[in-house]
Amino acid sequence: MASQGTKRSYEQMETGGERQDATEIRASVGRMIGGIGRFYIQMCTELKLSDYEGRLIQNSITIERMVLSAFDERRNKYLEEHPSAGKDPKKTGGPIYKRIDGKWMRELILYDKEEIRRVWRQANNGEDATAGLTHIMIWHSNLNDATYQRTRALVRTGMDPRMCSLMQGSTLPRRSGAAGAAVKGVGTIAMELIGMIKRGINDRNFWRGENGRRTRIAYERMCNILKGKFQTAAQRAMMDQVRESRNPGNAEIEDLIFLARSALILRGSVAHKSCLPACVYGLAVASGHDFEREGYSLVGIDPFKLLQNSQVFSLIRPNENPAHKSQLVWMACHSAAFEDLRVSGFIRGKKVVPRGRLSTRGVQIASNENVEAMDSSTLELRSRYWAIRTRSGGNTNQQKASADQISVQPTFSVQRNLPFERATVMAAFIGDNEGRTSDMRTEIIRMMESAKPEDLSFQGRGVFELSDEKATNPIVPSFDMNNEGSYFFGDNAEEYDN
């Protein structure tokens, strides 16, 4: 993007830092990762987890959720002001799985939030280390993106369920800061804005008074974030209109849905970063790896190297396929839920199958499931190649895509055509060209119609051997473009229920 010079890299957002050079960025990201790892080791000690139990991804998720809950100030304040029966606002906890007499057992633990905050700060040189907390949130968000479909949420805001490739980060909390905003898809932010506008339509006081002023500031800020994701002048001009509207209403909702649809072909810039479960960082720290000294990047080879030699386990339900569970977690680790399966499969060195053909449910286990009937197996999280994660949507062009998910949002910076079904997308743009944004709409539709199938995205960018740490010899893969490329094709995934 042309305005690259004015932007902070996401590592800088991630660490809350001002402008730093590459070495400083690598060191501060490394410090953040090391802090998560030290915290995890300490929690395993407190919970008396064996080495094997500490590598169980379900235990990792429980520990991660506890620290997020301990630092969720707004919710903590709310819980203290609205006490609910049987819930101690000062405590947090969850299921911890232990191996007892050859069987897995679930143990519900409860901890003082204050105690968890103490352990976290101690692991992070006495600081609150909010960057590390955001990093954990993004890992959970990536896991949700790979696991669930958001059909209901899309339909509720008047968007089309086939627009799921725009929904990255849809379960990220608002408090996830700049790093969180960077990884949100165009559809996610459009949906948040539509939700605000709808509240304003239903509630006369939403935009009024002191609270309303704050709401307005949040609205305009969100509009600017969405504007910054678009790469064409017409899309940005339309966002200015939405932002400047005196009294946002149905016209703005229409504009936002139009813009979200247009992003299926004129893709927005959405950041991708590999965020791994805390237990992976813990394992590395325990084996003597000094993240701050070595430096770390979320968008380079480092996460791939880390996964090459980490052994992580998962509980497997009786009828689940462990290889499929591995694919799900691999996609989550690399934020690849909306990537073209052919690209992911090439990098991973294993066939990657669409969501609808996976014999696995989510990673987390509900409290009413019988754990004793479950086995654990090793997650295969290694890869054949590595590739740089992208923060752009790639340039846009067309090619056959599937009936359910009609576009992709690239994760890896690898040369290919980007599939979308032009006929399907364009069908959504019939008529409706009136109103204040008509000239911009006409321009956007013209650009979409002239997007060419043969244009390659990320020209000359390729994947790299794992031995090629400096990314010197790109291998540009060739893909069989007749194969299915969308993950959510023929989908039967569970809905995300908060």
Swiss-Prot record:
**Record GO biological process:** symbiont entry into host cell; viral penetration into host nucleus
**Basic and acidic residues bias locations:** 8-22
Database matches in Pfam families: Flu_NP
Q: Mention one GO molecular function.
A: structural molecule activity
> Subunit details for this protein?
Homomultimerizes to form the nucleocapsid. May bind host exportin-1/XPO1. Binds to viral genomic RNA. Protein-RNA contacts are mediated by a combination of electrostatic interactions between positively charged residues and the phosphate backbone and planar interactions between aromatic side chains and bases.
Q: Which HAMAP family match?
A: INFV_NCAP
The record describes the protein's role as:
Encapsidates the negative strand viral RNA, protecting it from nucleases. The encapsidated genomic RNA is termed the ribonucleoprotein (RNP) and serves as template for transcription and replication. The RNP needs to be localized in the host nucleus to start an infectious cycle, but is too large to diffuse through the nuclear pore complex. NP comprises at least 2 nuclear localization signals that are responsible for the active RNP import into the nucleus through cellular importin alpha/beta pathway.
Q: What is this protein called?
A: Nucleoprotein
What organism is recorded for this protein? Influenza A virus (strain A/New Jersey/8/1976 H1N1)
